[in-house]
Amino acid sequence: MNIKAQIAAHLAGQAEPKRGEMREVHRRVLRASPGCRLWHSDGKDEKGKTVSNPTIGYGLQTIVYADGKAKEFFRIGLSANATGISVYVLGIKDKKLLAKKFGKRIGGASVTGYCIRFRTLKDIDVDVLEEAIRFGFAEGASEPEKNRTAVKKKAKAGGAKRKK
């Protein structure tokens, strides 16, 4: 099954009203970054053990670890959880910035360094959520290509290092 089909099945598998709300957030993420790379994780590790909630991912960033290994990962994530919905805004260097910029304006959501968690869309200002998503894409929009290139060059030269 391709990624779009996996995402459609994942969304269809949610009970209402969460299904409709997840579809609305999905639509807004795609509107914020049309044509972005899509990801889907079923939340299971290689052994089939559940390690996280299933997540839809959007966009691309390259994470470079301290040991020099690099991994491609999504910039924005969408996940249903037992109490509501989580939107992950990854790759922002300042871990206080997301909460500072959107925490008070978004309404009834918990905003941490990289996660916006809410019970229902009725509790939040959805336009501010979309603004936060756009911010997440823009904050490191040029980083994936720069990072990937830097990792390749450093790997050829004997290993990439994590920036401090």
List the predicted regions and their residue ranges.
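Charge-dense, helix-prone N-terminal extensions
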Residues: 1-164
